[in-house]
């Protein structure tokens, strides 16, 4: 009896000593505002799971001042508790992993990926920042069918399911949108106003293949980029510094705040890179502000202002022998004349509005303007060089009206909209003069001066029908037009004025997509789409006093069939797509009798492929020592062939032009197999680790398929420790890139054999390199 009384007394004493509190709340999706069920809420020894309507109730000790919210489909979030804690409204941000819940913007659907027809690659902020944060190249290359390459830090090429045969520099045939505002130029190329910095990007969606039905001209694909945002209900300041091999250093600072009606973030980035190779530096300074304002329940405003200034060196292509001898060397002409973008400045401003007229009718509109300047000594020899001074300014906008209606068992959604872009470009090119090798060159005689006004318009309409038996049908199309108004300002008795207006015929590009849900966790989709890819400015200008008025756009038709879903209690996600695309009127380079290169329509290709993305969530439990562990694999198979393809090359020994037939050959620059795989691990104590491996098959380097780049493998890894101490969050990390010290060239210069022997195909990438750094975050609210 005494023992029983003593037990009761001790129980009451301990219960009073460790007082309990009950916390209630609701968890919703940040984007859709829909309730999130199955989220795990932990605090001290307390643990519970959110219900079907997102509600939860948890009992925790009084001394516990935070809750950890985790879900397989969302980013883990730590919530600080006030005293006393009110009813908690918690919004979770999708981690873009679970296909049954993740929603996408692609094709203006704004619906679950499982209900969307088409191949779409997804990257969230965590995936974009798995490495050293120099750029998003390592992350983008984990998407099957996507290849991002770099001449140097800040100078990129991107291919989506395609060859870079006609893309000597920059980004071609890929449409880019920032928060639904178009940022590519009217001709489909991209300029320096687009900064691929992981610190300012919140998510990336990649639409593969022709997307002209809703996003204007292009056969390559679309990048939909959204900026990062402040965490819900939080005000914080963050700073970080990273240092690494080959003179890499990076400083980043940001201020973020989120309240009931506003989400504002300001970023500052200063990055320096001396470069792996000689004359291969890359420096940039970026400042930007992004804001999202809720004016009233019917109206949301988004604003961005960004400015980038920088410079980058161009080391030039090397032959295989030169690369094997010393991969860090620059082409001698490039080093002697500091071939580079000596300085670039780019500013972009955009504002967009979402207005809801009713529950069934809304409008989204955005406008932008940008300004850019370049100082660019270029070339590779005394026979090919120049000093370009260029300035660009432009403006444009995009609008869409969305109407929803329900009739019986059929739900309909109609999108009608348009897009307009204008760009004013003035360029003056001089001969390069340099009396002292290794110093900056000077302007010589002017040999080209022009003004180009580019205009692009698109009108689109799309209907989505949710049909009985879990069928989802999408039918749409766009009507696009592009024109160049060129004014030749160079006056000389020996020069032919090539001023003129080049207007391409308007083109209608339709798309049809169908999805069938096979239960809650599996869907099959099929689509057919037409593409229309007008030639960019560098294919219009022959650079010999003539205008290439005979060239016209490439046309493509694409067929896709795919299967996506998740199995094994939402642990295994898979997304598999097969496709076949026929491209006609392919633009090919032609070497002219005077040695210059022009372009013409002279080919067609057949492009067959398979893409697969698999993700397995081994562990997702915030209470376990290893709280998160997932593995993933990305694979692409590409069987691209020239159907009818003839080119011309110049025989320097006989000074004659030779016509070559490459029909039946593999398409230049497309590797048959590419694969990436990785593991991501997080622990309860704050230690985290990730590793990524890449494999790229041998790649044909010229149209004749007589030269190939060797296959190669690359491995990257990162290790870090995160810790929260009251209002401070610390992240210390270190990593290694190219752990195997593989000698490879990420960026290849195709058909370089046309310029003599030995051909300089290679632009060697960095060998084994290391980095380390720290981030500090102060939570003010």
List each model region and its residues:
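N-terminal periplasmic accessory domains that precede
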Residues: 86-91, 136-139, 157-159, 174-179, ...
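Short acidic/polar hinge/loop motifs at secondary-structure boundaries
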Residues: 59, 181-208
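Short, acidic, small-residue-rich periplasmic hinge/interaction motif at the N-terminus
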Residues: 28, 32, 40-42, 70-74, ...
